[in-house]
Amino acid sequence: LRLECARIMAGQKKEEPAGRAKITKAYNLPCHYVLHTVGPVICGAVTKTHREKLASCYRSCLELAAQSGLHSVAFCCISTGEFHFPNKPAAQVAIRTVREWQRKNPGKIEVIFNVFKNIDYEIYNCLLR
């Protein structure tokens, strides 16, 4: 997986911009494919542009998944953690973007929000009610 990602990056000859998606085989992971995206890095206050780039991450992944014939996608909390997007605003963008995409593409892809931290579980649990 790491070698395939390195080949993709070498072929591009530049870093992947925020908001786009790529797909690779999953190799030894318990799935068939991995969708890769780069979220916005937050330094200071979250702006409209940050929110738009984060939404683009989710839309790009969903479009690529649909084009690749996938029926389900599990999303982690994109751009939180190391990239410092605050958890609740990131979850709001994720849920809104996925719901909008699913309304326009009914029945195409099941989405799972896979969270690692209790705080994210609480946020998503509250927002998805």
Give the ranges of each region predicted by the language model.
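Phosphate/ribose-phosphate-bearing ligand recognition and processing surfaces
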Residues: 42-129
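Glycine-/small-residue-enriched capping loops at alpha/beta junctions
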Residues: 1-67
